[in-house]
């Protein structure tokens, strides 16, 4: 039928629907004819050159075809409109005034559009079903959508301007069914360029049953309740759900009552004439009602029993049963068919849907294997590249043809290079699966099998110039073993961003190296691989491609083992993806074998079952045969699954002696390597002799001797060892399953470092060794026993894997680097929770509920850990791998860093065994909660060295007393060495090198590595330190309200500044660096000082400012130094001690001598810039409690300190016991602060109004509490501070019981005023007495808001709980006015006069 015929009406189309001649339609001519028939005087429209701007999800690429979108601003004669079905959300915009273009649709939909919507028939063109039609040069086929009457899927084969075709499937709304797999037209679109997919239920929670099951349920309910005076109501759309109505009428043998509108619709569809439907309400008790009559279904079902009761009474029935057939109300539940009851009414939520559920969508994409999926529902289609679209497309990762996309990408290199060389005689077409049989004759005339001899030159020639430059840079940056193909794949993955390329490379370095080390595959091998992607319905060669180009298409060995986005795929999706590939590859002819040696094709790697090959023999079927027959079986199986057997042996680290046994297992598993591994590990006693010493060692797959709890006798143990019986810990075991006995709990004298370890000498240490120790230490209350366990753990590491000792120490101490390196994981609880959700397949709400109950994310992870079935069990976690991964996480910054961190964490989690995930999560959260930190780990490390050396070398030379002395001496030396040189990178290797000769003199202080600061004890008054300093000379110094700083000068002149925690803060104080350089003596080439940095107001006589002022100073970082010009808060440094100068360690010198050396380093000072701490000296003869002059002098000095805005004073011994002791808190240093002195500290009466869940030791309790005062003017509670000190464990337990049930509020009351957001809110019930150091202005807390500062409240620094106040009601607590007055009364406060 010619496209320019005048009969472009519905009736005209009907008359030609059976015509065997192919329809060839021209939309512009049809539109011109339609316009002319309506108004002959109407000028013929001018064809437009392009389609109006529309969403990508509505437009077919490279065409002017628009699907299901009719609200365009103007008409266009060249635009072809396609309507998939007659539902209002798809035909919105159509009306009787439509004249914007020609509408193509099915016959039934055309009738509905014309008769119901009154769209002029001249603009509606009905297309035949299952028949190819050419429209504007493109081929279009309509097939059944299984949605509603007249609903169709559109198959578009679009001709490109240059040459070739692109294929697209537009599903409209559809429900996938098995019949579609056999549709010949749809089969022709396997491997298409894109699928515009109905993603209504693209969510794993929507997996409702089949339509047949749902219809059967409705019919069974009607048959079961068929009584008199029972009315059945079925909710449906105006068009839709007809299938369920027809089945009810047919199987229940009764008519269906519909209203006039529904009847007219059914008549148009041809259903009303079958006698199944009636408008007479008295003819049947099954009535159809509107969609929302029985209740609202979105976003969740809300029944409308009121309306149901009205209908029941109006129609005179005693009972009413409603059915709401929809998938929206269904999620994975125990009861598929939920029922709501009320009185004599019930509503059945029937999971009947005419849209595909989640699994069906994935099956459909798996069947078609398109290059991409374009969602059409459930996202903002105006933002096609938005995150929601990308997130939805990830549901189909592994199901789309990603390899074809890579081929197209690399072929683009060839095209660009070919065009530059003006080799235009080769017509390159990228989509080989799209060529029809009639085009075979147009194939390249050259013919033959001209295969390039080398891939190297081709790759070089086909790379664009920009990528060539990038390749050169990558060759300089990456290791030499990285192949050019791998570089190209990385360039594509990261859009040429070299930073992302390099960072992602190192994330997957091990996998890339393993791939690069495989033999180079032959081109024939790759030809087989790519041929697997072409279905039997499309066997034709590519049109117009010369053999050279075909060879390139088939010859590229793109990375297949590594998926750079695999971290974003959920466990369920990963498993299904693997399964889909396996099933597809299994259909291939087993006789097709690659030629020559090389890397196995994907078919062979994923192959599970060979189709009845002659070599496939079941071991189980030969159990009665003689040994010779069994050997033949093994040989045959080995030949049939040779490559799988090789892989199996490699995974379990077996030798050739294991081959026969492995072949029998693999044959029993029919080539399924995962099943074979399960058999191997479930039947360990059957493993033949395979001596451990003969097995290869691998850093990724290790075997560990299995000594179960049941093997108590030495005979069993020896039998296990002699059999070579070993277990690979990559086998999933539950926490409750019997695991290797944890021998670290043995007494040190009975522990054998090598025999009791779970790995062998020379192998890398498994992470499970640490985890089992952590679990034992966690359950052990005694510190001595815990140290013994840690000692045993380290002994095995020293004996078997000394290179893993340092990473193990870091993991035991919850560190990944020395403090001064400022390297942190920088991950929060939300990221850990998100990774846990993906790794374990649980919901966020479940994680939150479990965390609220358990209070520890590690316990949550352990509880919800699930077995995840993968193609190959993941390798066991190694100590060094866990540590290196944590270091990788710490360096991830910038765009995409959160995703990369999450991927690394998920990868670790999925490899966890036993309790590994519990302690891994705790490590990520920086809280192991085993009660063993550095003070326990370091002595255990020293003990391990002595124990191993004693038993190995000195058993006869050392007496018991000497041994004990050495044990304690080395342990103490390790701790002391770390205090003066807190770098495990230095201490641990030195300890291993010196062995039992290690001592404190082994290491010395190093400028640039801060030592641990000396600490002071608290004194509650002046008299207290007189009692401790009788007849001993001492000094009193101001205790400044600033930041403790340790200042180092390095040999190269560099000045570094460290905080009291060892964090480097040099970038925050560039002005201080200049001051140190200016005033230090040139002769002092290196030194280490102890000082306090204080904010100062140099304009107002160098007045000292509060710590609050100093905290407003910019912090800076290694990558962003602040400049002296940008500094707004000036500082003065008060130096008071020196620990190291010019290579000499001064720690043992008395303070008096250290002061003298300090003044040699700084002979001059300058007020407001660098000063010595203000002090007074008390001689030994004056240090007496009876000396009232001295007592008065010190009291005056203390008051002077308060008036100078200091926290208090420091009292230090000058001569006796006056050394500098890192980390020590001794009587040699005492501190007297305002809130420690009786009579000086004011207390507040505050009300707890909320709390957070505790962490660490306080897990399961509430800590901290949010405290508030009361403002009687506004009648509201205003927050003052968080309190987390001063409580006992008994008090925590009491408060957990007290604040429960009705005392916990669902949300913050309107009369609570705060910027805090605690985990839960409490009703105002009790009053507590709180004491703090002083008051400060707060942007978060709201106490006294407007009374002191116009926009900020007042808070308390260092608050602590004193006691309960039982004689006051909550409204009688401290008021906002009280707090304001106390703020003004304090001597040290932030200057807020200039604040606005």
Curated annotation (Swiss-Prot):
Keywords per UniProt: ATP-binding, DNA damage, DNA recombination, DNA repair, DNA replication, Ligase, Magnesium, Metal-binding, Nucleotide-binding, Nucleus
Q: Report the locations given in the UniProt record.
A: Nucleus
What's the top EC group for this one?
Answer: ligase
User: For this protein, what is the EC number?
Assistant: 6.5.1.1
Short sequence motif named Nuclear localization signal 1, residue ranges: 572-579
Task: Kindly state which reaction or reactions the protein catalyses.
Answer: ATP + (deoxyribonucleotide)n-3'-hydroxyl + 5'-phospho-(deoxyribonucleotide)m = (deoxyribonucleotide)n+m + AMP + diphosphate
Q: Where does ATP bind?
A: 1037, 1044, 1060, 1092, 1136, 1212, 1225, 1231
Which Gene Ontology molecular function entries are recorded, alphabetically?
ATP binding; DNA binding; DNA ligase (ATP) activity; metal ion binding
Induction / repression: Induced by UV-C. Induced during seed imbibition. Induced slightly by bleomycin (BLM), a radiomimetic reagent that generates DNA double-strand breaks (DSBs).
Where Mg(2+) 1 is bound, by residue? 1092
Residues of the active site are: 1039 (n6-amp-lysine intermediate)
Q: Identify the domain of life.
A: Eukaryota
Q: In which tissues is it expressed?
A: Mostly expressed in buds and flowers, and, to a lower extent, in stems, leaves, siliques and seeds.
Q: Entry's InterPro entries? A: ATP-dep_DNA_ligase (IPR050191), DNA_ligase_ATP-dep (IPR000977), DNA_ligase_ATP-dep_C (IPR012309), DNA_ligase_ATP-dep_cent (IPR012310), DNA_ligase_ATP-dep_CS (IPR016059), DNA_ligase_ATP-dep_N (IPR012308), DNA_ligase_N_sf (IPR036599), DRMBL (IPR011084)
Full protein name: DNA ligase 6
**Upper taxonomic classification of the species?**
Eukaryota, Viridiplantae, Streptophyta, Embryophyta, Tracheophyta
């Amino acid at each position: 039928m010619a496209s320019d015929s005048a009969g472009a009406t519905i009736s005209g189309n009907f008359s030609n629907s059976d015509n065997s001649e192919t329809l060839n339609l021209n939309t512009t001519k049809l539109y011109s004819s339609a316009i002319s028939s309506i108004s002959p005087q109407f000028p013929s429209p001018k064809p437009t050159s392009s389609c109006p701007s529309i969403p990508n999800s509505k437009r077919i690429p490279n065409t002017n075809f628009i699907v299901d979108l009719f609200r365009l601003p103007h008409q266009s004669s060249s635009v072809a409109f396609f309507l998939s079905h007659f539902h209002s959300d798809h035909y919105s915009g159509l009306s009787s005034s439509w004249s914007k273009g020609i509408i193509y649709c099915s016959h039934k939909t055309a009738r509905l559009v014309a008769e119901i919507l009154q769209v002029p028939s001249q603009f509606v063109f009905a297309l035949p079903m299952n028949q190819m039609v050419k429209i504007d040069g493109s081929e279009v086929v309509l097939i059944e959508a299984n949605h509603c009457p007249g609903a169709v899927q559109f198959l578009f084969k679009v001709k490109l301007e240059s040459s070739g075709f692109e294929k697209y499937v537009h599903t409209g709304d559809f429900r996938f069914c098995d019949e579609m797999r056999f549709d010949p037209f749809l089969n022709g679109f396997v491997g298409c360029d894109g699928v515009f997919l109905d993603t209504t239920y693209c969510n794993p929670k929507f997996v409702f049953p089949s339509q047949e099951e749902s219809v059967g349920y409705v019919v069974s309910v009607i048959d079961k309740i068929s009584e008199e005076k029972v009315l059945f109501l079925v909710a449906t759309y105006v068009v839709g759900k007809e299938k369920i109505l027809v089945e009810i009428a047919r199987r229940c043998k009764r008519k269906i009552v519909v209203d006039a509108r529904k009847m007219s619709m059914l008549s148009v569809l041809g259903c009303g004439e079958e006698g199944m439907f009636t408008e007479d309400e008295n003819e049947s008790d099954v009535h159809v009602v509107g969609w929302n009559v029985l209740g609202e279904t979105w976003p969740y079902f809300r029944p409308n029993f009121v309306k149901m009761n009205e209908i029941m009474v109006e129609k005179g029935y005693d009972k009413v049963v409603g059915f709401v057939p929809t998938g929206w109300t269904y999620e994975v539940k125990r009861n598929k068919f939920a029922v709501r009851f009320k009185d004599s009414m019930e509503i059945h939520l029937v999971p009947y849907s005419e849209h595909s559920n989640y699994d069906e969508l994935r099956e459909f994409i798996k069947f078609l294997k398109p290059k991409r999926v374009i969602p059409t529902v459930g996202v903002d289609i105006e933002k096609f590249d938005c995150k929601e679209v990308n997130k939805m497309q990830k549901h189909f990762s592994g199901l789309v043809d990603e390899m074809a996309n890579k081929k197209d990408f690399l072929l683009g290199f060839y095209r660009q290079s070919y065009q530059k060389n003006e080799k235009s005689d080769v017509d390159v077409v990228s989509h080989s699966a799209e060529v029809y049989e009639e085009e075979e004759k147009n194939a390249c005339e050259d013919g033959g099998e001209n295969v390039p001899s080398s891939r190297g030159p081709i790759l070089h020639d086909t790379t664009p110039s920009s990528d060539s430059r990038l390749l050169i840079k990558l060759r300089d940056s990456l290791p030499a073993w990285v192949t050019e193909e791998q570089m190209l794949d990385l360039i594509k993955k990261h859009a040429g961003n070299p930073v992302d390329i390099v960072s992602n490379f190192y994330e997957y370095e091990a996998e890339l190296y393993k791939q690069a080390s495989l033999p180079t595959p032959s081109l024939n091998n790759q030809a087989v691989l790519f041929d697997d992607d072409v279905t039997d319905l499309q066997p034709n060669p590519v049109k117009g491609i010369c053999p050279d180009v075909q060879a390139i298409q088939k010859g590229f060995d793109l990375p297949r083992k590594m998926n750079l986005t695999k971290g974003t795929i959920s466990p369920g999706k990963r498993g299904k993806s693997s399964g889909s590939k396996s099933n597809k590859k299994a259909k291939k002819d087993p006789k097709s074998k690659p030629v020559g040696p090389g890397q196995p094709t994907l078919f062979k790697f994923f192959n599970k079952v060979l189709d009845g090959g002659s070599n496939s023999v079941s071991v189980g079927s030969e159990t009665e045969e003689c040994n010779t027959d069994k050997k033949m079986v093994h040989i045959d199986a080995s030949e049939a699954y040779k490559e799988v057997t090789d892989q199996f042996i490699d995974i379990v680290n077996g030798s050739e002696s294991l081959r026969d046994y492995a072949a029998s297992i693999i044959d029993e598993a029919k080539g399924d390597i995962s099943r074979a591994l399960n058999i191997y590990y479930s039947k360990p006693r059957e493993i033949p002799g395979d001596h451990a010493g003969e097995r290869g060692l691998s850093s990724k797959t290790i075997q560990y001797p299995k000594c179960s709890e049941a093997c108590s006798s030495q005979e069993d143990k020896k039998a296990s060892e002699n059999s070579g019986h070993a277990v690979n810990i990559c086998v999933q075991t539950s926490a409750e399953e019997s695991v290797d006995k944890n021998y670290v709990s043995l007494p040190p004298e009975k522990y054998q470092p090598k025999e009791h370890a779970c790995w062998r000498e020379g192998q890398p240490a498994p992470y499970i060794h640490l985890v089992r120790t952590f679990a034992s230490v966690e359950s052990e209350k005694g510190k001595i026993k815990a140290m013994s366990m840690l000692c045993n753990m380290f002994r095995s590491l020293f004996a078997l894997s000394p290179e893993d000792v340092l990473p193990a120490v870091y993991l035991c101490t919850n560190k990944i680097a020395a403090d001064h390196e400022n390297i942190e994981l920088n991950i929060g609880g939300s990221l850990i929770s998100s990774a846990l959700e993906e790794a374990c397949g649980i919901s966020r709400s479940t994680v939150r509920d479990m965390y609220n109950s358990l209070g520890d994310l590690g316990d949550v992870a352990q509880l919800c850990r699930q077995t995840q079935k993968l193609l190959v069990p993941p390798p066991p976690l190694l100590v060094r791998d866990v540590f290196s991964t944590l270091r990788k996480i710490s360096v991830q910054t910038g765009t995409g860093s959160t995703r990369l961190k999450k991927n690394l964490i998920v990868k670790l989690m999925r490899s966890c065994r036993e309790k590994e995930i519990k302690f891994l999560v705790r490590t990520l959260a920086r809280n192991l909660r085993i009660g063993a930190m550095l003070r326990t780990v370091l002595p255990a490390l020293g003990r391990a060295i002595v124990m191993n050396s004693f038993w190995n070398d000195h058993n006869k030379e050392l007496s018991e007393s000497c041994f004990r002395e050495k044990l304690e001496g080395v342990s103490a030396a390790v701790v002391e060495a770390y205090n003066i040189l807190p770098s495990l990178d230095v201490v641990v290797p030195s300890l291993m090198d010196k062995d039992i000769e290690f001592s404190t003199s082994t290491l010395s202080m190093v400028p640039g590595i801060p030592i641990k600061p000396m600490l002071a004890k608290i004194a509650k008054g002046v008299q207290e330190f007189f009692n401790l300093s009788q007849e001993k000379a001492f000094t009193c110094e101001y205790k400044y309200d600033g930041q403790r700083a340790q200042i180092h000068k390095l040999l190269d002149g560099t000045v570094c500044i460290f905080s009291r925690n060892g964090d480097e803060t040099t970038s925050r104080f560039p002005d201080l660096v200049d001051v140190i350089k200016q005033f230090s003596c040139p002769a002092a080439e290196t030194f280490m000082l102890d000082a306090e940095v204080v904010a100062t107001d140099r304009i107002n006589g160098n007045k000292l400012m509060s710590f609050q002022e100093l905290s407003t100073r910019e912090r800076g970082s290694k990558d962003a130094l602040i400049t002296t010009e940008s500094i707004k808060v000036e500082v003065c440094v008060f130096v008071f001690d020196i620990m190291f100068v010019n290579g000499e360690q001064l720690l043992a010198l008395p303070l008096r001598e250290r002061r003298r050396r300090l003044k040699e380093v700084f002979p001059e000072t300058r007020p407001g810039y660098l000063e010595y701490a203000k002090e007074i000296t008390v001689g030994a003869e004056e240090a007496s409690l009876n000396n009232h002059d001295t007592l008065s002098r010190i009291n005056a000095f203390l008051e002077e300190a308060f008036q100078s805005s200091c926290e208090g004073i420091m009292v230090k011994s000058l001569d006796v016991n006056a050394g500098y002791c890192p980390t020590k808190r001794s009587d040699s240093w005492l501190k007297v602060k305002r809130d420690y002195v009786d009579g000086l500290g004011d207390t507040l009466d505050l009300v707890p109004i909320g709390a957070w869940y505790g962490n660490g030791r306080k897990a399961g309790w509430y800590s901290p509490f949010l405290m508030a005062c009361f403002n009687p003017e506004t009648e509201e509670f205003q927050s003052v501070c968080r309190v987390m000190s001063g409580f006992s464990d008994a008090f925590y337990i009491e408060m957990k019981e007290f604040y429960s049930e009705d005392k916990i509020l669902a949300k913050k009351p309107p009369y609570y005023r705060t910027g805090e957001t605690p985990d839960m809110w409490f009703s105002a019930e009790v009053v507590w007495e709180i004491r703090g150091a002083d008051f400060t202005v707060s942007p978060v807390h709201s106490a006294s808001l407007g009374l002191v500062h116009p926009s900020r409240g007042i808070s308390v620094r260092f608050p602590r709980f004193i006691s309960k106040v039982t004689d006051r009601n909550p409204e009688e607590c401290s008021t906002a006015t009280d707090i304001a007055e106390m703020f003004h009364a304090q001597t040290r406060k932030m200057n807020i006069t200039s604040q606005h």
